[in-house]
Amino acid sequence: MSRIGKKPVQVPAGVTANVDGQKVTAKGPKGELFFVANDEVSVKLENNTVVVQPVNESKDARAKWGMSRTMIENILKGVKDGYERKLEINGVGYRASMQGKNLQLALGFSHDVVYQTPEGITIAVPKPTEIVVSGINKQQVGQVAAEIREYRGPEPYKGKGVKYAEERIVRKEGKKK
């Protein structure tokens, strides 16, 4: 029995949810998202709560049960509040700036890295050493933040590079003489 899957998902105020077979659609103040559940689970909308149940007791159905419930919860929260991920840049001369819709990063390479902002994502640079990625799709926000971090991940000796704001870098000691 899935501990996460058996909890019903409350539809937040200001959000309308619609279940059409396996497709769950959510409309809210920030936009509209949908999720198509696997055939191994059944999705029902009962008095402003979405209930997800496995079709049978197979291991595959039970594995997809909790994941489907969490995906539905993520789209309901995304269209109401949205998601955001903060990144920090550490290092001498390392900085970020916006050039139109593109993010320009100076990360110690011989050239600046230009990252094209995907559709549905907003990137803000409040300070030259801080990047805020926001959007309504949790998976897409996390993916964009990971792609930006990947250009120059934090190194363990001085901590230089791009890291998540809440990330703690485990530091190493340098060589001994």
Swiss-Prot record:
Keywords: Ribonucleoprotein, Ribosomal protein, RNA-binding, rRNA-binding. GO terms for molecular function: rRNA binding; structural constituent of ribosome. InterPro entries: Ribosomal_uL6-like, Ribosomal_uL6-like_a/b-dom_sf, Ribosomal_uL6_a/b-dom, Ribosomal_uL6_bac-type, Ribosomal_uL6_CS. Pfam families: Ribosomal_L6. Belongs to the universal ribosomal protein uL6 family. NCBIfam families: L6_bact. Part of the 50S ribosomal subunit. This protein binds to the 23S rRNA, and is important in its secondary structure. It is located near the subunit interface in the base of the L7/L12 stalk, and near the tRNA binding site of the peptidyltransferase center. This is Large ribosomal subunit protein uL6. It comes from Sinorhizobium medicae (strain WSM419). The lineage of its organism: Bacteria, Pseudomonadati, Pseudomonadota, Alphaproteobacteria, Hyphomicrobiales.
